[in-house]
From Swiss-Prot:
Every Glycine radical domain range: 5-127
Alphabetical UniProt keywords: Organic radical
Top-level division of the source organism's lineage: Bacteria
Record's GO cellular component terms: cytosol
Species in which this protein is naturally found: Erwinia tasmaniensis (strain DSM 17950 / CFBP 7177 / CIP 109463 / NCPPB 4357 / Et1/99)
Entry function: Acts as a radical domain for damaged PFL and possibly other radical proteins.
Protein name in the entry: Autonomous glycyl radical cofactor
Amino acid sequence: MITGIQITRSANSDLHNSFWLLDSETAQARCVCANAGYSEDQVVAVSDLGQIEYREIPLDVKPQVRVEGGQHLNVNVLSRETLEEAVENPDKYPQLTIRVSGYAVRFNSLTPEQQRDVITRTFTDSL
């Protein structure tokens, strides 16, 4: 848990009236601002602050959405034969829509190279 503090008393005069974020899980303190001796965002062990007195400062913490990695899946429900037929006879399939990179696109609007690529990537013999 993160707690905001203002140091009100310390043997180290550089710490007096400085503001810190204390992380109780890692036992570390991050300097928010100090008159001297510490730079903004400097991280030190809480024990390095020595004997201090402080007052807690209310924090307004907004939840963060973290996306770490992830995968994307496009699902096209049709057969290889249908796509190959659409390549040969585009007039018969004017409304054929597929998913490519998260977007819906008309198959006939793709270049021949893109159409071949879609067929190759959609229908594989093994993973």
